A protein has these predicted regions:
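DNA replication initiation on ssDNA origins
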Residues: 1-69, 77-86, 153-155, 160-163
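An amphipathic, hydrophobic-aromatic interaction surface with interspersed Lys/Arg
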Residues: 94
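Short, conserved phosphate-binding/catalytic loop or strand-edge motifs used
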Residues: 97-106
Length: 180
């Protein structure tokens, strides 16, 4: 399972994101420290993510500016997940919807081959507009990165952290949680 998960989120080969939860705040949110770590995303890190030991993020854009996965990040705290799920289906968009850490949604696009990030971002922008979220974040955030000078793309938190008790899961047609 971990190997397939890593394959789905294949991106930058030289870095990943990592989040450590520090403590809970009064408003119910958690205080966390998020950093970019300049080591590859590995099966061991995926295991730690799925077990809840570490929160891991993946960088969709590779050093050659190609992507095999991408995402829309909709951070709307009053988001009606069922309505959004139905809209994705009605528009026949090839997106896998997951509840995000904030209670919004990450809508993932998985491709069978690597495609230039600029092309993917154009398609994501079209999909976001069709869904009524034209100003949401797109991952990759960059059309290109200058790998030769050490630039990296931005990372997105992966779903299913602490998979047995997660609040970050994929949603079926009825917006009910799907297990791994």
């Amino acid at each position: 399972m971990e190997k397939r998960f890593l394959e789905l989120f294949s991106g930058c080969q030289s870095a990943h994101g990592q989040t450590t939860v520090l403590d809970a705040q009064r408003n119910g949110k958690t205080k966390a420290n998020s950093i970019t770590v300049r080591t590859p995303l590995t099966i061991e890190l995926i295991k730690e993510h799925l077990s809840g030991k570490k929160g891991i993020g993946a960088i969709p854009i590779r050093e050659d500016n190609l992507c095999q996965f991408a995402a829309l990040d909709i951070d709307d705290y009053n988001l009606d997940l069922l309505m959004l799920r139905k809209k994705v289906s009605r528009l026949e968009l090839p997106l896998v919807m997951c509840r995000s850490k904030s209670g919004g949604a990450h809508l993932y696009l998985f491709m069978t081959e690597f495609i230039p990030a600029a092309e993917i971002r154009d398609k994501l922008a079209e999909m976001a507009s069709a869904l009524g979220f034209g100003s949401c974040e797109l991952f990759p955030k960059q059309d290109t990165v200058k790998a030769e000078r050490g630039d990296l793309g931005s990372w997105i938190n992966l779903p299913y952290q602490n998979s047995e008790y997660t609040t970050r899961y994929a949603l079926d047609e009825g917006a009910d949680s799907l297990t791994l």
